[in-house]
Amino acid sequence: MNAIIMCDEYGCIGIKGDQVIHLKKDLARFKEYTTNKVVICGRKTLETFPKKVPFPNRTTFIVSHSLNKSEFAKYTDRNVIVGSLDEAIMLPRYVNTSDIFVIGGASIYQQLAPFIDKVYLTVVHEPMDNYYARINQDYNFDYYSKSFAPFEIYDKAKDDPINPNFEVIQKFKATDTIKELDQDVEVDFMILRRK
């Protein structure tokens, strides 16, 4: 499984139940990675979607005890599954794990952490309040990370620059060597990062 996460430097993922910043480049990246794939989210994350409706061109697995699939029947262009966390954990038996993306919220990320092999992370330098966890502390295995160059974008409300970092964090396998991962990495706690 994969996860797509936007958080601040402290591992917080939102403010008052919503994503604090909507970055066009980050949303385009989200769309690119998840189109024609399976996304797993909780009910509260679904409520942050435009019109509280699952995205088109994806199979959306909603982890919920209070919703049922019939509520989404009118959206014929969207394949929606409503089920338990245990059923979400069973998805890799039926779908290639590289085609599954966990998209939130905090509780879903934490509960599915042992099953996640790769994290697509956007780190913003704006404070948030819904604590998720530091990636290297919540997952009990080593990772290596490849950072993408930050880019600058302006927050129109504040006219301040926002410089998020994009990273891909992947399970570190015992058979991998640092040389295979990247030539110029440095150890940062349990994460290996490209300089």
Please identify what each model-predicted range represents:
Residues 4-38, 43-195:
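Flexible, gly/pro- and Lys/Arg-enriched active-site loops
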